[in-house]
Amino acid sequence: MHSEAREAEARRLLLQETLDAERTFLERNQWGQFATPPSLAGEIMRYTIDLHEETRINFLEPSCGSGSFFSALLRNLGDKKIEHAVGVELDPRFSKAASDLWTGQGLRVIEGDFTSPSLVSGPVASLLVANPPYVRHHHLGIDQKRDLVARCADQLGIKPSGLSGLYLYFVLLSHRLLRADAVSTWLIPSEFMDVNYGTALKEYLATRVQLVRIHQYDAAEVQFDDALVTSSVVVFRNSPPRPGHTAEFSFGGTLSEPKVTHQIPSAALTPEAKWSRYVTGVMPADINLKQTGPKLSDFFKIRRGLATGSNAFFIIPRSEAERLGIKRNFLRPILPSPRKLKGDAITADASGWPDIPEQLALLDCPLPIEDLLLENPALAAYLSTADEKIRGGYLVSKRSPWYKQEQREPAPILLTYMGRGKDDQHPLRFIRNDSDAVATNMYLMLYPTALLQRYLAGDPERIKQVHKALLAITAADLRGGGRVYGGGLHKMEPKELAALPADGIATLDPVLREDISMVSVPPRKRTGRPQMPGPSASEVRAWARANGVCVPDRGRLRPEVWDAWRQAHAGEASPLNIDAGDQVALW
């Protein structure tokens, strides 16, 4: 059996290479076809078989491809025996290949969609191992997504997000095919631990089954040559979580020799939390993951940088713009790629442009083309060189005129949107911007809230102290707050940045912390004594409108609206005059 399995595996590898070459990378990406390397398949199978306590195995491999995991099963059986083995594959080329290779070894290959409710009836599997298709949601049809979501909700009472990748539905819809206490192992992207659409899978792992282990491979050691994703192995048993049970979270190295290992009580696993923190150990399990102290959102409004629609066309060297004769009032200073900024601070020259070797200009003009021809023929001539690809782009085609950019003020603080960094090296950089330059969407732009603006207004040098406090945020906090992709690429979204702790800023001045508590203290429970009156949201909303402040018809009011109300009513019976022990919530 071993020699036959080795010979079949050698044929499989050659066939896999041939079949992969028949499709372009884009086509394989749309199918989610990323073959499991044989060494990785063997490592996963050895670990999983050891968890299978019964001698007889009923094996199921969803999206079996050419049969990499079945091949690994044959090579690592030991004293166990295969009673039944089923592989499911949608691609007819691979289903035929797997059938030709492995039917003689006991694998029954079913050609079809694994998520189809009628394809396989269950429960059939005591052992399931899979590398499901990594198909992103935008490659799934609307009706297909609606059907998948509905069946997950019907079978498990769990409703996934429409942004979920196909792999998430594979895991959830496999539940009906698992025997009691079956071992189920999945090689899937690590993103589910951190993104919002991974909540459904985390709910399943935390509440419906007994999670055994999640091992996240080091992002710098990409497991697939043709897929820039960070991979994790997720292992669970089909049995309810037991009181006192702990799950193993490990990182880096291999399954048998990880770099880091943590035991996390199942009771501590909440679907809403970022589970990558358990993997890396950034956030111990006994700490409440809900941030209760000051957050960056208390001090900054965070927005993505400008999306021009075509940086190569709309952003040109300032010297080139001046050589062409483009007037200065149609040029806005804009920062280059983060790679070209060596320090953590950008100073300004006498004109307000960033003091860097190559200054870049963003072309921005509100005039219609007929007026522009008269006002600045040189700019009109340059714009006439835009090809149809630029003019027909989504962002450009929605603008009027098409060369007018989004209006954005320079931000005093920037964060690089993506970056790399291991151990204590920060993957992302906070940059102080003393110039008049705006930034592209390679950055996040941090604008001080009214609360922080009041502090900064007292001394122009205070922005340096705020920047220093941001630089003190640890590399671990940045990694724990963001997400990581294959090759060690880290990314931070605005909401993730907003949720990072900001104690370092709050401690710069006692007034800052007091102002935060004034708008964030939870309401006191009612007691026998009456509470001092405070303004209702409707009262503040009415006052704001009467004073020309734009506020929404319903929902939470922005903190700066409350700030403005308090300043206008200083000395009256307002929450500012209530003793600290009797403060009430303002929003």
Swiss-Prot record:
Q: Which reaction does it catalyse?
A: a 2'-deoxyadenosine in DNA + S-adenosyl-L-methionine = an N(6)-methyl-2'-deoxyadenosine in DNA + S-adenosyl-L-homocysteine + H(+)
Q: Which InterPro entries match?
A: DNA_methylase_N6_adenine_CS, E3-bd_dom_sf, Lsr2_DNA-bd, MethylTrfase_TaqI-like_dom, N4_N6_ade-DNA_methylase, SAM-dependent_MTases_sf
> Mind telling me which Pfam families this protein's record contains?
Eco57I, Lsr2_DNA-bd
Query: What molecular function does GO assign, one term?
Result: DNA binding
Q: What start-end ranges are recorded for coiled-coil regions in this protein?
A: none
Q: Which GO terms describe its biological process?
A: DNA restriction-modification system; methylation
Can the keyword Transferase be found in this entry's annotation?
yes
Any S-S bridges, and between which cysteines?
Answer: none
Enzyme class, spelled out: transferase
Q: Which Enzyme Commission number(s) are on file for it? A: 2.1.1.72
* PANTHER family, per the entry: DNA METHYLASE (MODIFICATION METHYLASE) (METHYLTRANSFERASE)-RELATED, DNA METHYLTRANSFERASE YEEA-RELATED
Assigned protein family:
Belongs to the N(4)/N(6)-methyltransferase family.
**Described purpose of this protein according to its UniProt entry:** A gamma subtype methylase that recognizes the double-stranded sequence 5'-GTCGAC-3', methylates A-5 on both strands, and protects the DNA from cleavage by the SalI endonuclease.
Protein name per the record: Type II methyltransferase M.SalI
Q: Which gene encodes it?
A: salIM
